[in-house]
Amino acid sequence: MIDIANTVPSAFYNSNTSDRLPYESRAQAIAEVSLPYVFRADGSDGGTELFKSVSQSFNGRQINNLKAKMGMALLPPATSSFRLKPDALAMVQLFQGNETAIERVRQNLSLNTDAISSEIENQQIRSSLFDMLLQQIVVGSVIVEKNERAGMTIFPLRTFVVKLDSRGEPLAMCIVEKLQKLPEGITPKDEKEEYELYTLLALDKDTNKWIMKQDIDGDAVGVEKTYKDYDALPFRYFGWNWVQGDAYHRPFAEDYYPDMQQVDKLAKLNTEGAVIAAKSVLLVNQRGGRTRKKDLTDAANGAVIDGHADDVTAFQLQKNFDFEVSNSREGIIKRELQANFLDTGSVQRDAERVTAEEIRVMAQQLEASTLAGVYSKMALKWSKWIVTKVMDELNITFDAVDVDVLTGLDALGRSQEAQKQDNFMQRVTSLQLNHWIKENEVLQRYASFDGINTVGLIKTSQEVQTEQKAAQEATAERTLVEEGAKSAGQEAGKAVANPQAGGPQ
């Protein structure tokens, strides 16, 4: 831990940039063979020619594919990426079987889930999530700031330094921002066209709390703030792979950089070779033959000139076999990269007829085996943090019952839970044991699997009881009327059959 009280943010930043250099070089090398704009060379600007270093778009497409799939998994558009799960034991102890109270809690959870999901969409957090994932795939480390009710701000590697503990978690981080307009509450000592604002966040060794302090040109600005723990900070550091002894996290693409580099070199070789091989050049034997180059050049299409066919030949590179070798190698590496970056194009087997169902099944198997590990790296750290931040902004609290925010595979495992319940219900039906099942509980569970808001959709227990009572009363009344009509009919029949009954004898 650092002595935050005696540490100047700008001095801390400048003294730790040297540890960052190897990770900058690694990120730039990966970007140069994939998406150069993600990590541009130091000193480049909007006028710099970015794609001079790259010879193909394949690597960039794989990175964008993985980014899209991870983004859709972390923030799926059709359902919530999290679950609000109440403490089951507390529910039993508190409500003691009161189904009306339990339904009220579930409706409250459903409404809050919708409110959180809507707020995430309104703040356009999804687009910032894609930018953050891109940084982690190509660069490895990134810092995110959650702006209150205003989405997120992404800070790439060249804008911050960090100190990590023995588990790869941050102990201190400092961010530099180049601003023309300073945030509210920060007054500089001197007026400038552009300011460099340094923000230091560090764990205080004495209080075990996080402190945030800022400076411009070494002069303290703003108000020093204290946060109870790391989760309370508006800033959060995210990294991909970390190895003991590393100063920063390593990117996902580093594992596959040799293959990406080979694809780029082979693509350049095959492209340049194809251009040369496709070049149309005619060779004319003027000295020993009867054909003149000028006659051939000036001849119109379909013209007749003096000459001999053997005097004219077309240039041929005759490197077809060599290009087949390089093309084959490029194809093999591309298929391996497609599998590693979750591109479903890699699952299609080399055959004349491949059904869509076959591709779908193989793609599901690929993503089930690979995406689970990739996705789990981000779900708990990012999803739970962002959901908690949005809940704080919306002042959503649960006082009666403790509620856990489930993210990651626990949240996305709802389809498997629904399938298990389907199988269970089929088995119960086959055994003719449906009378043991609480229908309302079944409906609530199915709705929770898909994140459906049940408020106003599913009847409450009280409504069902009222309807059942009304139906029973209607049935009883109908039965009474029918029995009365039947009795009256029987009496009338007796009177017709025996008209003298009751008369004088």
Give the residues covered by each predicted segment.
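Extended, helix-rich architectural segments
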Residues: 1-182
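Short, hydrophobic/amphipathic alpha-helical patches that form generic packing surfaces
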Residues: 69-76, 257-272, 444-448
